[in-house]
Amino acid sequence: METKRSKLYLLTLGCSKNMVDSEVLLAQAKANQIYLAEDFHEADTILINTCGFIDKSKQESIDQILEAIRFKEAKRIKKVIVFGCLSERYKDALREEIPEVDCYFGTRDLSQIIAELGGHYKTHLLGERELLTPPYFSYLKISEGCDHPCAFCAIPLMRGKQVSRPIDELLLEAKKLKEKGVRELCLIAQDTTYYGHDLNGKRQLAELLQRLSDLQFDWIRLLYAYPAMFPTDILPVMRERENICKYLDLPLQHVSDEMLKSMRRGISKRKTTELIAQIRSEVPGIRLRTTMLVGYPNETEEQFSELVEFVRETQFDRLGCFAYSHEEGTEAHELPDTLTEEEKERRVELLMAAQEEIAYAKNQALVGSFMPVLIERFEANFAIGRTEYDAPEVDNEVVIALDEAEQKKVKVGTFYQARITDAEAFDLFGSLVL
């Protein structure tokens, strides 16, 4: 007797790594002829891929679970299934607090989820994904988990130790993405630069980049690079391969030596400064993105000022900043959360104000230059796109005014040469060169 298949609506919360997990699950569901609903109104089952990174993420996940429960109680759906990071970490507590959820799964339970939906996990679908991104770009998750002991981070509690995927497996998946029309490939992991060390005792990111470059994607972008023990052998590859973006996402978190030691980041301010200088020297024209964490336990005003001054001196091209979240189970949770939320937000605003000045000056320097732009969408008479130096969703956009003839020619997912005509801190403006 055949098991009845579900009509599935999948809600994905959190980061791009979660999105890839959802894409793999959707490919399995589709292969099992499970109906994939575009709207929860069409579904009998809501599946929620949760995030548990910080308090704000946890609350969003819980709010969505409770909303799904209300749909179930109103008999608009039959079943609610929860999986992902929040469920991995707090499965027992969630079962006790929200028993109305039918099933809780963790981050490694794909086959069990498919079985719960009435299907069977198909091992031959290696590398198959139903893309949730636009068809012209995609993420490639090169490893799972993390071996670093950062005191503030709960990721190892949810994702476990690092497990790198074999190069041949990644190449197979990348080829399938290329066949789907993907032109920009963004490499992601908890730490991309540690890739391969668990496979044969040595890191293999340089080799992976070379072999992916050979597949002739237009852009290959490296995200989530860890600064400690940075594999400098990737720098010649980034310099010499034209389709590897001259862009690096290098989250530093802080530069005060006292803060770095307490955070257990494994690097000093001096080593950080030397690394940035080496990257910029070996890859001329590279754009650096970083992320900073302020309001960490016992961060003094002097240490925060040191961070702001470092940002001004270093002149990062892109920068994000987060207020510290006191996460239970982490080493930092044993420290007193010394700063108020208001003070943390004040520091975020001050640091971002400093970065805004830097970003404005850097963008103004681009006025009059020409660069390729990947068009992503249209708004009224404008085409919106990104340059090689901007990652999806987090960085600058280029706003291009189109005349009537251009509106008929320009297509989403296509590269066009653009002349930059004006700039703000976080946006460029331009015209097409057709």
UniProtKB/Swiss-Prot annotation:
Please name the CDD domains in this protein's record.
Answer: Radical_SAM
Q: Where is the Radical SAM core domain?
A: 132-361
GO BP terms in the entry: tRNA modification
Which chemical reaction does it catalyze?
A: L-aspartate(89)-[ribosomal protein uS12]-hydrogen + (sulfur carrier)-SH + AH2 + 2 S-adenosyl-L-methionine = 3-methylsulfanyl-L-aspartate(89)-[ribosomal protein uS12]-hydrogen + (sulfur carrier)-H + 5'-deoxyadenosine + L-methionine + A + S-adenosyl-L-homocysteine + 2 H(+)
Query: Could you name the Gene Ontology cellular component terms for this entry?
Result: cytosol
Amino-acid positions noted as binding [4Fe-4S] cluster 2 in the UniProt annotation, renumbered to this chain: C146, C150, C153
Occurrences of domain TRAM (ranges): 364-434
Cofactor(s) the record lists:
[4Fe-4S] cluster
Q: What molecular function terms (GO) are annotated for this protein?
A: 4 iron, 4 sulfur cluster binding; aspartic acid methylthiotransferase activity; metal ion binding; protein methylthiotransferase activity
- Which positions are annotated as binding [4Fe-4S] cluster 1? C15, C51, C85
Query: Which residues constitute the signal peptide according to the record?
Result: none
Q: Which Pfam families match?
A: Radical_SAM, TRAM_2, UPF0004
Q: How is the cofactor bound?
A: Binds 2 [4Fe-4S] clusters. One cluster is coordinated with 3 cysteines and an exchangeable S-adenosyl-L-methionine.
Entry EC number(s): 2.8.4.4
**What subcellular compartments does it reside in?**
Cytoplasm
> Which keywords does this Swiss-Prot/TrEMBL entry list?
4Fe-4S, Cytoplasm, Iron, Iron-sulfur, Metal-binding, S-adenosyl-L-methionine, Transferase
Chief location category: cytoplasm
Q: Which PROSITE patterns match?
A: MTTASE_N (PS51449), MTTASE_RADICAL (PS01278), RADICAL_SAM (PS51918), TRAM (PS50926)
The answer to whether keyword Nucleotide-binding applies is no
Residue ranges of every copy of the MTTase N-terminal domain listed in the record: 6-122
Instruction: Please state which protein family the record places this protein in.
Output: Belongs to the methylthiotransferase family. RimO subfamily.
Q: What does this protein do?
A: Catalyzes the methylthiolation of an aspartic acid residue of ribosomal protein uS12.
Q: What is the designated name of this protein?
A: Ribosomal protein uS12 methylthiotransferase RimO
Please tell me the species this chain comes from: Chloroherpeton thalassium (strain ATCC 35110 / GB-78)
